[in-house]
Amino acid sequence: MASFRSSLLSALCAYGMMVMPAYAIDPNHPKLHHHKYSERLKKRHTEDSYLSSSSTLESSKTFAQEPRRHVLTPIRNVLADRPCEEGLSISKLFNSIEKETNSQISVDFTILPQWFYPKKGLLKAVDEKQPTWQFYVSPNVSWQLYNSPTAGVGSIDFSYTLVRYWRNNAQNANNAIGIAGGINDYSTRTNTLSQLTFSQTFPENILTISFGQYSLYSIDGTLYDNDQQSGFLSYALSQNASATYSSGSVGAYLQFTPTPSINIQAGFQDAYNVSGSSFDLYNLTRNRYNFYGYVSWAPQSSLGSGQYSALVYSTRKVPEQPVQTTGWSLNFGQHLGEKLYVFGRWNGATGTVTNLNRSYVLGLASANPINRNPQDLLGAACSMSKVNPKVITEKKIRKYETVIETFATIGFGPHISLTPDLQIYIHPARRPDKRAAKVYGVRANFST
């Protein structure tokens, strides 16, 4: 069995190296439609777009001259590029690997200290330790195995989320200031296999089928309200605050893209793996599945590009999440000229899984506003969320909780950025004695 797997992998590698240069980007992530992990890869390649295209052309010529290569040739060529000749250069190493394997690789590392007020909970006598220190690492890989006019494109996509805390965690901060949401997207330590899929895109790039582990978080949102590492920090503005779907689970989905501006998906997942902490094929035999449908329209107008999407999903009752739910999420994002981007979201879910069962979001962002650095970004947004009284058991709670957040990302070269961030919670749901709560943070990003 081991010999068979080794032979199969060698064959896929060899075949992929012979035919892969036909596309620069995998078509299973449509260019005009938001995909959380694809955006990370796209961001990593923005600075090197010219180099990538020239490398692709050069590779095409090389492959035309050498239609057959040994499976170890990419390793030899990476070493021949000498990425560490003038000191260790992670970017140069990744560029060499990408060129030889027709893959895209990014690693994002974030350090996030956050200070919060009030400092102690309603019935607590001691202040919580400040600040909370969050460390967030997210590697992402997209590898094109093969590409031919008759077989189409086959690719493997991988993304992992690793979150750790030092001194104190965000859950204790949430309790101290009395909010039903969260001061960031991951309140405690997290290990999540967000994506590990094989995708087959058929000729004409209209139909794609994907198998493996994936999460709806990757498509549920727009450019800046769906990723704590690059946009807003607060729970209600960095994701769907009422989401009850899995953080990553095994299943499959079918994607139909009749035109570049239309993307339609339908799929299912194992219902048992709610946290996405493992990759478990056995759960598919236990006859509990979650289902979803998704439609996205990305018009191109004189004002700029936009995206309007709708997601509907249902989850089954399992021991890990003992409530059956139905949820929805409506999103829009629209560029208004070169520098201004407006976005919004309305989402909700039934059941008693989350603290918030409705959320309304409206915001704006301006990328590189003074043409100083491509990483520069200004953002301001507001979210009003309805509190789920069946989940929060305090005797006195507010029905709604509102957060206003603003941030400014300052880029230092292509790989480092700092983001001062301010969150103001108006009428925190679990602190009826407080009119407002405040959270200050500084996000430091290191990306390859």
Swiss-Prot record:
Single Gene Ontology MF annotation: porin activity
Positions of disulphide bridges: none
Signal peptide: 1-24
Gene Ontology cellular-component terms listed: cell outer membrane; pore complex
Cellular localization per UniProt: Cell outer membrane
Residue ranges of coiled coil: none
Keywords assigned: Amino-acid transport, Cell outer membrane, Ion transport, Membrane, Porin, Signal, Transmembrane, Transmembrane beta strand, Transport, Virulence
This protein's record includes keyword Ligase: no
Membrane topology: Multi-pass membrane protein
First-listed, main subcellular location of the protein, grouped into a coarse class: membrane
Keyword Signal set for record: yes
GO biological process: amino acid transport; carbohydrate transport; monoatomic ion transport
Domain of life: Bacteria
Entries under InterPro entries matching the protein: Carb-sel_porin_OprB (IPR007049), OprB_sf (IPR038673)
Similarity comment text for this entry: Belongs to the OprB family.
Function description: Facilitates L-arginine uptake, as part of the AaxABC system. The arginine uptake by the bacterium in the macrophage may be a virulence factor against the host innate immune response.
Protein name: Porin AaxA
Organism, scientific name: Chlamydia abortus (strain DSM 27085 / S26/3) (Chlamydophila abortus)
Gene: aaxA
